């Protein structure tokens, strides 16, 4: 009888463990940015082509990943502004393509605009487009990995901010594409923090 109670207790404990783990998995977002110990959901992505700068062989592509509280406003098919509140991350990537990201690992290098690098990147938390006074953290090192799953991107990043705090995350989904030629170098989200 004692063995039966122990067996039932073990089965009950194991069931609770499995249900608890499944619940934890269900509550974590599929796309997120993590700063220190705090996790923020990401739900939308933008890919902006700024073409080539100077003598660099690489195209300048900006990737902006945003939380669900933001709405992008367009004018004549180009980004005009952003409204709402939330969090996001921006990568300035040097790539061989102009309309998509290469499947590759991009390494942070603030001194270079070589293929396969990124620089001038930052994460923004608690941004309110009405007050434009976010908590902004410049990225000082790290890696961004780009993969494809069918027609959707899988971006993962593991970086440090200028204070040495970890900024990491994953984004799974599409990136809305905007093409800015030489005449539109100043285009993009006008009221988004810019560290360039």
Q: Each predicted region: which residue ranges?
A:
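Bacterial Sec-dependent N-terminal signal peptides
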Residues: 16-44, 179-182, 190-196
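N-terminal targeting signals for Sec/Tat export/insertion, comprising classic cleavable signal peptides
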Residues: 40-54
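C-terminal or internal capping secondary-structure element at the end of a domain, subdomain, or sheet
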Residues: 142-196
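Sec-dependent bacterial lipoprotein signal peptides
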Residues: 1-19
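Surface-exposed helix/loop patches within compact recognition domains
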Residues: 52-147
């Amino acid at each position: 009888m004692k063995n039966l109670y122990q067996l039932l207790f073990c089965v009950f404990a194991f069931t609770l463990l499995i249900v608890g783990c499944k619940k934890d998995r269900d509550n974590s977002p599929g796309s997120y940015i993590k700063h220190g110990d705090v996790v923020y959901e990401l739900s939308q992505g933008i890919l902006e082509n700024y073409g080539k700068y100077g003598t660099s062989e690489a195209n300048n592509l900006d990737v902006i990943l945003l939380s669900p509280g933001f709405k992008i406003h367009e004018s004549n098919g180009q980004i005009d502004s952003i409204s709402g509140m939330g969090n996001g991350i921006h990568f300035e990537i040097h790539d061989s393509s102009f309309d998509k990201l290469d499947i590759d690992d991009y390494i942070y290098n603030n001194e270079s605009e070589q293929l396969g690098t990124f620089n001038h990147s930052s994460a923004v938390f608690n941004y309110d487009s009405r007050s434009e006074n976010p908590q902004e953290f410049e990225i000082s090192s790290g890696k961004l990995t780009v993969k494809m799953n069918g027609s959707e991107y899988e971006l993962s990043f593991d970086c440090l901010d200028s204070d040495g705090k970890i900024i990491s995350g994953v984004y799974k989904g599409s990136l809305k594409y905007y093409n800015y030629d030489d005449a539109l170098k100043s285009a993009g989200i006008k009221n988004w923090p810019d560290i360039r």
